[in-house]
């Protein structure tokens, strides 16, 4: 039983790390492309900014979902019931 709990906590930590890394890379690429495109066409900067914030919200949702799944696995582990 302790093995299942330990493995679940390690998997949750890896899940959180990968989600944070993916979100950070996504924000870096998004910000770079936004600055590049608004420098090329300054008249489209306002419409590009709106689209950037929409995509930023979707990027943030990825890490929030990962945190929710990790908390589910840590505090309400569904795999422990399989051992009983």
Swiss-Prot record:
Membrane topology (UniProt): Multi-pass membrane protein
Any single Gene Ontology cellular-component annotation: proton-transporting ATP synthase complex
Keyword hit for Membrane: yes
Transmembrane annotation, as ranges: 9-29, 54-74
Subcellular location: Cell inner membrane
UniProt site (Reversibly protonated during proton transport): 60
Membership in a protein family: Belongs to the ATPase C chain family.
Protein purpose: F(1)F(0) ATP synthase produces ATP from ADP in the presence of a proton or sodium gradient. F-type ATPases consist of two structural domains, F(1) containing the extramembraneous catalytic core and F(0) containing the membrane proton channel, linked together by a central stalk and a peripheral stalk. During catalysis, ATP synthesis in the catalytic domain of F(1) is coupled via a rotary mechanism of the central stalk subunits to proton translocation. Key component of the F(0) channel; it plays a direct role in translocation across the membrane. A homomeric c-ring of between 10-14 subunits forms the central stalk rotor element with the F(1) delta and epsilon subunits.
Protein name in the entry: ATP synthase subunit c
Source species taxonomy: Bacteria, Pseudomonadati, Pseudomonadota, Gammaproteobacteria, Pasteurellales
Gene name of this polypeptide: atpE
